[in-house]
Amino acid sequence: MRNFDLSPLYRSAIGFDRLFNLLENNQSQSNGGYPPYNVELVDENHYRIAIAVAGFAESELEITAQDNLLVVKGAHADEQKERTYLYQGIAERNFERKFQLAENIHVRGANLVNGLLYIDLERVIPEANKPRRIEIN
């Protein structure tokens, strides 16, 4: 008997939460967990991604959404400062984090607050997909 860990699916696929009970496959994480992030279900049709980007300025972050893929990139401006660390526990490396979005999930905005990048998402259900009442004659 095999046990499947579906937690990687919850972390990188936004808007598929209704389908997770049916899934049996696991998705691999290729970017090693940096930077750390949370995916929050705000309400039935709203999600929020919070990414820890301490040390990055707003100008060093780039967010793009194309088709069903959300890409967040962070690239530090080249600095020629030499530093001597006694201990370095804060990562200063560049990153690229990708999130596969479900159909009908749209990015509504982003803001940077106290080292956390918040990206707000919304599920927009087209009128054609909404249930409609059929009257009986």
Curated annotation (Swiss-Prot):
Location in or out of the cell: Cytoplasm
SUPFAM superfamilies membership: HSP20-like chaperones (SSF49764)
Gene Ontology cellular component terms for the protein in this record: cytoplasm
Gene3D superfamilies for the chain: 2.60.40.790
Pfam families for the chain: HSP20
sHSP domain sequence ranges: 28-137
InterPro entries: A-crystallin/Hsp20_dom, ACD_IbpA/B, HSP20-like_chaperone, HSP20_IbpA
GO biological process, one term: protein stabilization
Alphabetical keyword list: Chaperone, Cytoplasm, Stress response
Functional note: Associates with aggregated proteins, together with IbpB, to stabilize and protect them from irreversible denaturation and extensive proteolysis during heat shock and oxidative stress. Aggregated proteins bound to the IbpAB complex are more efficiently refolded and reactivated by the ATP-dependent chaperone systems ClpB and DnaK/DnaJ/GrpE. Its activity is ATP-independent.
Quaternary structure annotation from Swiss-Prot or TrEMBL: Monomer. Forms homomultimers of about 100-150 subunits at optimal growth temperatures. Conformation changes to monomers at high temperatures or high ionic concentrations.
Family affiliation: Belongs to the small heat shock protein (HSP20) family.
Identification of the protein by name: Small heat shock protein IbpA
Phylogenetic classification of the source organism: Bacteria, Pseudomonadati, Pseudomonadota, Gammaproteobacteria, Enterobacterales
